[in-house]
């Protein structure tokens, strides 16, 4: 799959997920076969004002063996343009813009999925990003805002007209958040509406899902999100490739990478959520969740890993 001038080794993409797609998770996903990984969403305005918490989201030292996209969110074209030009983004291969986040505090600012109701602003935001870089600019959207507002095909056309290189479609509405089923027919309609690559997202958990999404929608790529949490090897499974997965070794590598650029306290907090997902397919899942509630120090973290993994 090719996005603009960036060639991917396959059509599988790790979805951006706030608080989860840190450098450790992105590295492991790349090792197990992801063709592209994407950062957690980063505030364009925060980047412009050099928010100290933003730099950690942009770590690329352990990028793995595939291209990496940075995902920005914002609704002000000027801030988007300045963010794209920021030196901290120089090592990213693709610029992605979030137009799908359903969280209330983002939506109330007119950002994320709120943009699905404002095609004129969508055009201006994408155009601003495209004008600021030679790299491909992509956009992640949802099916629509409310369940009776399926605007993805219209928004995708606007993105293409503004110079967007690809569009990823989470086939749920903002109203759904992450509940109910993804409507893959929306992905098909988007694919029929534009000439740029379309990436499908939603309810892909096994190889059969991956193959069916490709066949029924005609999408060019498939983005995997929650199904990859604690299971970076899903990218090998979806491609029907052999793999070996040592969960303890994966956790330790994850911690090692985070420790290269984050303070110990932040590493511990970051790993609390990650450990729950690493444990979800083990017989110790409940014990791990209970132990995490009392996790305070690195020694506690190591004890949990040694005891349950």
Regions found by a protein language model. Give the residues of each.
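Glycine-rich, positively charged N-terminal anion/phosphate-binding segment
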Residues: 1-2, 17-93
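Alpha/beta enzyme core
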Residues: 81-111, 120-196
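Alpha/beta catalytic cores of nucleotide-metabolism and tRNA/nucleoside-modifying enzymes
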Residues: 8, 18, 24, 132-134, ...
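N-terminal small/glycine-rich loop or linker at the start of catalytic domains
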Residues: 1-13, 45-68, 101, 106-109, ...
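Active-site beta-loop-alpha junctions enriched in small/polar residues
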Residues: 17-19, 42-44, 73-75, 100-102, ...
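Hydrophobic alpha-helical membrane-association signature
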Residues: 118-125, 250-251, 271
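Hydrophobic faces of well-ordered beta-strands that scaffold small-molecule active sites
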Residues: 12-16, 37-39, 68-72, 95, ...
């Amino acid at each position: 799959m090719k996005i603009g001038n960036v060639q991917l080794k396959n059509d599988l993409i790790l979805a951006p997920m706030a608080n989860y797609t840190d450098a450790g998770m992105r590295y492991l996903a790349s090792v197990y076969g992801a063709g592209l990984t994407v950062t957690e969403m980063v505030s364009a305005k925060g980047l412009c004002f050099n928010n100290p918490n933003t730099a950690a989201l942009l770590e690329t030292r352990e990028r793995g063996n595939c291209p990496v996209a940075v995902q920005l969110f914002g609704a002000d074209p000027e801030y988007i343009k300045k963010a794209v030009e920021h030196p901290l983004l120089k090592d990213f291969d693709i610029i992605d813009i979030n137009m799908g986040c359903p969280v209330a505090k983002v939506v109330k600012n007119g950002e994320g999925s709120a943009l699905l109701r404002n095609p004129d602003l969508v055009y201006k935001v994408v155009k601003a990003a495209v004008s600021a870089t030679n790299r491909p600019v992509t956009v992640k959207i949802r099916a629509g805002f409310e369940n009776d507002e399926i605007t993805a095909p219209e928004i995708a056309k606007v993105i293409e007209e503004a110079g967007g290189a690809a569009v990823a479609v989470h086939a749920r509405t903002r109203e759904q958040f992450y509940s109910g089923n993804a409507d893959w027919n929306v992905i098909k309609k988007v694919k029929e509406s534009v000439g740029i690559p379309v990436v499908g997202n939603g309810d892909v958990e096994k190889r059969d899902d991956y193959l069916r999404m490709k066949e029924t929608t005609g999408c060019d790529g498939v983005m995997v999100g929650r199904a990859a949490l604690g299971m970076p090897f899903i990218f090998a499974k979806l491609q029907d490739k052999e793999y070996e997965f040592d969960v303890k070794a994966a956790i330790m590598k994850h911690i090692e990478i985070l420790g290269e650029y984050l303070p110990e306290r932040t590493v511990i907090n970051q790993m609390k959520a990650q450990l729950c997902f690493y444990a979800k397919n083990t017989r110790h899942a409940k014990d791990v969740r209970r132990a995490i509630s009392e996790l305070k120090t690195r020694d506690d973290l190591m004890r949990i890993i040694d005891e349950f993994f």
